[in-house]
Amino acid sequence: MNTIEKFENIKLFSLKKIIGGKTVNYGNGLYCNQKKCWVNWSETATTIVNNSIMNGLTGGNAGWHSGGRA
């Protein structure tokens, strides 16, 4: 049984041209694709609690990460 497969590296520029099937995770429980957006409320609640605590402990210098991650 051969467990190692040869694969080709894809450049980021080429990868960005692929359309469809992409879901963006914004890191706070919000997810969006081309058709809809939805919220994972347990992830959102955890993010809010974590960021609130870290903001309190660091005097406002931590938490509230924003920005999409594809």
Swiss-Prot record:
PTM summary: The disulfide bond is essential for the activity.
Signal peptide feature range: 1-21
Biological process, per Gene Ontology: defense response to bacterium; killing of cells of another organism
Entry GO CC: extracellular region
Positions of disulphide bridges: 32-37
Protein keywords: Antibiotic, Antimicrobial, Bacteriocin, Disulfide bond, Secreted, Signal
Taxonomic superkingdom: Bacteria
InterPro entries recorded: Bacteriocin_IIa, Bacteriocin_IIa_CS, Bacteriocin_IIa_dom_sf
Record localization: Secreted
Family: Belongs to the bacteriocin class IIA/YGNGV family.
Function comment: Heat-stable antibiotic with bacteriolytic activity against Listeria spp., E.hirae, E.faecalis ATCC 19433, S.bovis 83, S.uberis 42 and L.lactis.
Descriptive protein name: Bacteriocin ubericin-A
Annotated organism of origin: Streptococcus uberis
